[in-house]
Each structure stands twice: as structure tokens, then as C-alpha cells.
């Protein structure tokens, strides 16, 4: 049997998704969309509650990203080490809610704006501090969650 060649790398055409594949993926897509809308609404609420002044340091975006990363640190410990979750919990909350809440695209835009406004030291500090804060938040939150769980079990 020969496979039709295409202009794609390797020249092999991808198989069309089966009907059963769509049926199993539709709930995942739906919960990611629902969670994403929820997370984005929460981020928008944070920007209204804690607005960034024109030309100021983007503390809201910085805080949202750090908090979102801390929450995902706790969430991953709970669903991987404590109690397995329903198959839609991780895509809803981890990918959807937290993906919609955190905003690394706005981080990039904020960084570019700081540089464009001639605020090089602030832009560089923000550019370096955000991923450092995000990674530290994930690590510390996961560590703290494990400590609390160990303490509760003893």
C-alpha cells in the first residue's frame, strides 16, 4: 500500500481524526475553554482591583503570574501525589483556569513597553524577575504542600 505524498516534512499525510477521537476530546476542549474564560475573568478583575499606573512597574501582571504559578505548584502535588483527579480536572483547572489567569504574553508586552519608554533598568529587572518569581513560586508552593501533607500524615 502506498501513502499519498504531500508537501509536509516527510511527505506523509496525517490521518484524519476518528469520530471517537473527537467524542473523547470534545469534553476536554470544552473544560479548557470554560476554565480559560474563568481564569481570564479573574485576571481582568485583578487588573481592575490593582491597576498599573501609566509608566509604572507592572505589579499586577507580576503578581498574577507569581500567584498562578504558586497555585499550580500546590495543584500538581495534590493531583499527582495525594489523590488522582477526574480526567477533566487537570485540563479545566491547570490548563484552563490557571492558563487563563497567568499571562506571560502580557509580561512580554509589558517588558517591550518598558524598553520602548526608555526605562531600560526597570524593563531588565522585570524581564529577569518574572520568570525567577514564577519558578520560585512553583517550587516553594510544591515544597510547602508536601511539608503540610507530611505533617498531616504524622
UniProtKB/Swiss-Prot annotation:
Gene Ontology terms: biological process: cellular detoxification of fluoride; fluoride transmembrane transport
Reaction catalyzed: fluoride(in) = fluoride(out)
Regulation of its activity: Na(+) is not transported, but it plays an essential structural role and its presence is essential for fluoride channel function.
Localization terms from the record: Cell membrane
Keyword Protein biosynthesis: no
Record InterPro entries: FluC (IPR003691)
The entry's keywords: Cell membrane, Ion channel, Ion transport, Membrane, Metal-binding, Sodium, Transmembrane, Transmembrane helix, Transport
Transmembrane segments: 28-48, 59-79, 91-111, 124-144
Molecular functions (GO terms): fluoride channel activity; fluoride transmembrane transporter activity; metal ion binding
Membrane topology: Multi-pass membrane protein
Residues that, per the record, bind Na(+): 99, 102
Pfam family membership, one: CRCB
Any one Gene Ontology cellular component term annotated for this protein: plasma membrane
Keyword DNA repair: no
Protein purpose: Fluoride-specific ion channel. Important for reducing fluoride concentration in the cell, thus reducing its toxicity.
Annotated PANTHER family: FLUORIDE EXPORT PROTEIN 1-RELATED (PTHR28259:SF1)
Family: Belongs to the fluoride channel Fluc/FEX (TC 1.A.43) family.
Protein name per Swiss-Prot or TrEMBL: Fluoride-specific ion channel FluC 1
Protein species of origin: Streptomyces coelicolor (strain ATCC BAA-471 / A3(2) / M145)
Gene from which the chain derives: fluC1
Amino acid at each position: 500500500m502506498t501513502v499519498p505524498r504531500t508537501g509536509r516534512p516527510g511527505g506523509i499525510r496525517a490521518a484524519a481524526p476518528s469520530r471517537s477521537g473527537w467524542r473523547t476530546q470534545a469534553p476536554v476542549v470544552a473544560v479548557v475553554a470554560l476554565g480559560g474564560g474563568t481564569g481570564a475573568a479573574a485576571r481582568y478583575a485583578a487588573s481592575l482591583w490593582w491597576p498599573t499606573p501609566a509608566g509604572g512597574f507592572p505589579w499586577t501582571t507580576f503578581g498574577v503570574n507569581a500567584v498562578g504559578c504558586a497555585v499550580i505548584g500546590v495543584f500538581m502535588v495534590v493531583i499527582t501525589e495525594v489523590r488522582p483527579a477526574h480526567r477533566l480536572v487537570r485540563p479545566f483547572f491547570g490548563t484552563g483556569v490557571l492558563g487563563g489567569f497567568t499571562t506571560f504574553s502580557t509580561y512580554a508586552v509589558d517588558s517591550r513597553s518598558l524598553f520602548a519608554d526608555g526605562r531600560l533598568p526597570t524593563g531588565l529587572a522585570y524581564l529577569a524577575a518574572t520568570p525567577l518569581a514564577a519558578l520560585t513560586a512553583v517550587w516553594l508552593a510544591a515544597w510547602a504542600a508536601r511539608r503540610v501533607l507530611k505533617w498531616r500524615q504524622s
